[in-house]
A protein has these predicted regions:
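Long, hydrophobic alpha/beta structural blocks
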Residues: 1-303
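C-terminal, beta-strand-rich globular interaction domains
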Residues: 275-349
Length: 349
């Protein structure tokens, strides 16, 4: 967890980065450092740090040969060793970011760099470099009062509480590529991120969050895509497995792959199929997954949002299933020529 209760924003720079495909260019003023009064510092501290307060998903800068060749790593390294270079290095970052802004969805906007001191990350004192690319601006109403009347003005400004594209780089794990966290709400989940993949060029740290997240995805993919065809499971069976998979991650502090396999799949054929799929999955994605680790509840909460325990019947009915596979029966009515579900229950609301 990130504690910024005593944090100080000692340097703050601003430039403007446009969309390269639209030839909008980059604006780097001769003086990128912005002097801040106390209230502005307080607003920026909250805007740039609060979104990362409870994050457990961390990354390192990545380079195929050596991380010391990574351009952003080099720039951050320079700033951490000499914060006085913030202004010059911020201009270099803006130029690098512009080269990555070719997606038509990327809007031109301010690019901020903040240098934060007196932070605590998991109880360890750290300094950090914050990067914030403004994607959208909002309209604000401002009233002015006089003895006779009020006047109303519409101002264009940056929403301080909505980070859509940002990163926070900490001055720890320098040899590995600096520990950092990142936000990108612009790119879709299944598409390449201009921010994470092209500009930051990062790789996830292989920790408890990483293992929990990927085992949930692995199990979900097996249950919803592989098992129905290989093991002949219907929609009710797959929902039951998804629910029991969720219960395992929510109810246990430690994950053990064999315990999970035998708890979730009662038949040996199912267990063998899951073990085989796990091997295929880890090889296909080059994932060095652990067999035993502490479960990250933040990863559980985030990942299980994507699994839908819903049986959709034509366009008329939806059945939400949260457990008790034994209370649902599926069949076929010969007389009506239609499939049916029978649900047993004790009370209704």
């Amino acid at each position: 967890m990130l504690d910024y209760s005593a944090a100080r924003l000692t340097r703050f720079t601003a430039s403007w980065v446009g969309n390269k495909q639209r030839f909008e260019g980059v604006v780097i003023p001769s003086r990128t450092l912005i002097p801040l009064h106390d209230y502005a510092e307080e607003v920026i501290l909250s805007a740039m740090l609060k979104p990362f307060e409870k994050t457990e998903e961390f990354f390192y800068f990545h380079h195929d040969e050596d991380v010391s060749n990574h351009q952003l790593y080099q720039i951050c390294n320079t700033i951490f060793h000499d914060p006085e270079t913030c202004s010059d290095e911020a201009g270099k970052l803006a130029q690098l970011l512009y080269q990555c802004c070719e997606n038509p969805k990327i809007q031109g906007g301010e690019f901020f760099l903040g240098y934060f001191e007196d932070l605590m990350l998991h109880g360890e004192p750290v300094t950090a470099i914050g990067l914030w690319k403004v994607q959208n601006r909002d309209s604000y109403l401002k009233t002015e009062r006089s003895q006779e009347s009020f006047t109303l003005n519409v101002l264009d400004g940056i929403p301080a509480g909505k980070l859509s594209i940002a990163a926070l780089i900490f001055n720890i794990d320098e040899a590995e590529g600096y520990r950092l966290c990142a936000i990108d709400t612009v790119s879709k989940k299944d598409e390449r991120s201009f921010w994470k993949d092209e500009f930051l060029r990062i790789r996830p740290i292989e920790d408890n969050y990483f293992n929990t997240r990927h085992y949930i995805q692995l199990a979900g993919e097996f249950i919803t895509q592989k098992a129905p065809f290989q093991l002949g499971l219907d929609r009710t069976d797959t929902i039951d497995l998804l629910n029991r998979s969720g219960d395992y991650f929510k109810d246990n502090e430690m994950f053990e792959v064999e315990d999970f396999t035998q708890t979730l799949f009662k038949e040996e054929e199912q267990q063998d199929a899951f073990r085989e799929f796990r091997e295929e999955y880890t090889k296909a994605y080059a994932l060095p997954l652990e067999d035993k680790f502490d479960i990250s509840q933040q990863a559980v909460k985030k990942e299980f949002k994507i699994f839908k325990s819903i049986i959709k019947l034509d366009k008329n009915f939806h059945i939400y299933v949260h457990g008790r596979r034994d209370l649902i029966e599926r069949g076929f009515d010969e007389e009506k020529g239609k499939k049916y579900y029978k649900v047993f229950y004790e009370s209704e609301e």
